[in-house]
């Protein structure tokens, strides 16, 4: 049991490091967003939904700390979106992968849009570019990330099957 926990922790740490490294490149949101979402999907489906949650909590804080995300009030909104994406894709995706990823993308968009609207309702001055980046753009980047994740997961499945076959 303990060995499995270490295995999960190491895989989660590797995906978190990959996400942080990619974020640090400072690429446009339409490139970074799909990659980070793909990593969240892969963590949730290949390791566990809670692995995806861990990566989804770490990445917005890291983006803020290194200056990629400059508007702190949206950090909880991003975390809520990432957590919803990881949990839905991880649990629904076990039974119906395409439905799980698509539903997760839509729910992430709805959660983040609702979160931004809540910030505005409570008096937070959300700059227009931040509003745009945290609403409809999230749907697009999550859907593109789902397509990337499906390809990665298929590759991991093939690699894992070969590895298991060779170890027998």
PLM ranges: what are they?
Residues 1-168:
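Loop-helix junctions at membrane interfaces
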């Amino acid at each position: 049991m303990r060995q499995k926990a270490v295995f999960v922790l190491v895989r989660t740490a590797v995906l978190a490091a990959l996400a942080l490294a990619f974020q640090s490149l400072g690429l446009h949101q339409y490139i970074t967003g799909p990659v980070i979402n793909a990593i969240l999907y892969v963590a949730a489906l290949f390791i566990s939904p809670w692995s995806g949650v861990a990566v989804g909590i770490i990445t917005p804080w890291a983006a803020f700390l290194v200056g990629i995300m400059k508007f702190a009030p949206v950090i909880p909104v991003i975390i809520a979106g990432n957590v919803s994406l990881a949990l839905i894709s991880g649990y629904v995706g076990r039974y119906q992968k395409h439905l799980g990823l698509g539903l997760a993308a839509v729910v992430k968009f709805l959660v983040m849009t609702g979160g931004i609207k809540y910030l505005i309702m409570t008096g937070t001055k959300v700059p227009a570019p931040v509003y745009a980046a945290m609403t409809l753009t999230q749907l697009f980047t999550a859907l593109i990330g789902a397509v990337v994740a499906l390809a990665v997961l298929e590759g991991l499945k093939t690699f894992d099957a070969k590895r298991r076959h060779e170890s027998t």
